[in-house]
Amino acid sequence: MSTGFFGDIQKIKYEGPDSTNPLAFRHYQPDEIVLGKRMEDHLRFAVAYWHTFTWPGGDPFGGQTFLRPWFEDTMKAAKLKADVAFEFFSLLGAPYYCFHDADVRPEGRNFAENTKNLNEIVDYFAEKQAATGTKLLWGTANLFSNRRYMSGAATNPDPDVFAFAAATVKTCIDATQKLGGENYVLWGGREGYETLLNTDLKRELDQLGRFLNLVVEYKHKIGFKGTILIEPKPQEPTKHQYDYDVATVYGFLKKHGVENEVKVNIEQGHAILAGHSFEHELALANALGIFGSIDMNRNDYQSGWDTDQFPNNVPEMALAYYHVLAGGGFKTGGTNFDAKLRRQSLDPADLLIGHIGGMDCCARGLKAAAKMIEDKALSQPLADRYAGWESAEAQKLFRGEYSLDEITNWVESHDVNPQPKSGKQELLENVVNRYV
């Protein structure tokens, strides 16, 4: 049943690359076969509940610009928001969505009331999922907006805040499991510091490790089959965040013995804030065996903060999905649009148009990446570059069968005098441009 919020807009359909209809897909075809698999099953698109339905359009210099009929902190408004959200998912044909607890329920007076409100809306979501076929990609807890978390959640100097946060995460994992969610995400927006003058780094990192182990233990206790994901970000809102980037997260996971239990949800905008490219973080996560899922968006490269815009750069998407595909593709993860409208984009149709453009951009990137893989456009030059390591002697060297003394003797006796070879960066950049 239509809520009327989107007027007479009908379900978004594919019309082909020559279409000028802003409410149609030009490149995204869910059933198109790419590398032997449906495009929808490769991309696994999800809509972010928070940016799409709860963001008021404010910025540091101005308040709310969006006037949504559900912008009240009541259960009635929460259910109206859910009605509009699931209508949106159906219009867009999005197979998944993601949420924080605070996005979907009204704020209660205490933990018990928060839990009651969450359970009520989860039951409502279950009905909506059954009616529409939309599924939950992942759930998470908002442990950063409420003032109780201003000094952190897991890393808070007050153990009562730690306990409140841990109990909240339990309820959110329960909700995620009840709704058939395929992952559970931890993002430590306040797990960091503003100044070292009042921060015990070792204590806070140890607290964070204990918190993470509690989550992993509870996952196994209840038989949750999904993946636990950490989302790296270097800063914002804190000056320095402990889950800075993929490399930092991996070191943290290793220290606390959960590197085989937890993977990463990588956001393009966060990679940029950390001084990396998106594909760097994806490639590193693959190399370390912790790639899980992605939050798809882009940052304004001039702004210096997290602008969460919809992706529109096909070459960037092609390289991103190249690494996703090269790593075997998504297992339980997917492509969550952690992106929001600009505050002047007031029309309900703008919500659809932003997602349509992002989905088309990702589809073009996916197809370009798939073609590069089929043609071995990058993998063959890479194999050629490292071919020397495939020899028997080089394999022994790699496996550690020679000591430094033996290596030195071998270099001297064989008069080893290697000469450099071209890295062919310009050629490879031109190769990529042929596909995009």
Curated annotation (Swiss-Prot):
**Chain sites annotated for binding Mg(2+) 2:** 267, 270, 306, 308
As for family, the record states: Belongs to the xylose isomerase family.
- Source taxonomy: Bacteria, Pseudomonadati, Pseudomonadota, Alphaproteobacteria, Hyphomicrobiales
Note the subunit structure: Homotetramer.
What Pfam families does this protein map onto?
AP_endonuc_2 (PF01261)
Subcellular localization, as worded in the UniProt entry: Cytoplasm
* Organism annotation: Rhizobium etli (strain CIAT 652)
Q: Which GO terms describe its biological process?
A: D-xylose metabolic process
Cofactor requirement: Mg(2+)
Q: Looking at the UniProt record for this protein, which Gene Ontology cellular component terms does it annotate, in alphabetical order?
A: cytoplasm
Cofactor binding description: Binds 2 magnesium ions per subunit.
Q: Which reaction does it catalyse?
A: alpha-D-xylose = alpha-D-xylulofuranose
Q: Which domain of life is it from?
A: Bacteria
- The enzyme's main class, written as a single word, is isomerase
Keywords tagged on the record: Carbohydrate metabolism, Cytoplasm, Isomerase, Magnesium, Metal-binding, Xylose metabolism
Amino acids binding Mg(2+) 1: 231, 267, 295, 338
Q: What name appears for this protein in its UniProt entry?
A: Xylose isomerase
Q: Which InterPro entries match?
A: Xyl_isomerase-like_sf (IPR036237), Xyl_isomerase-like_TIM-brl (IPR013022), Xylose_isom_bac (IPR013452), Xylose_isomerase (IPR001998)
Q: Which GO terms describe its molecular function?
A: magnesium ion binding; xylose isomerase activity
User: EC?
Assistant: 5.3.1.5
Active-site feature positions: 100, 103
Question: SUPFAM superfamilies under this entry?
Answer: Xylose isomerase-like (SSF51658)
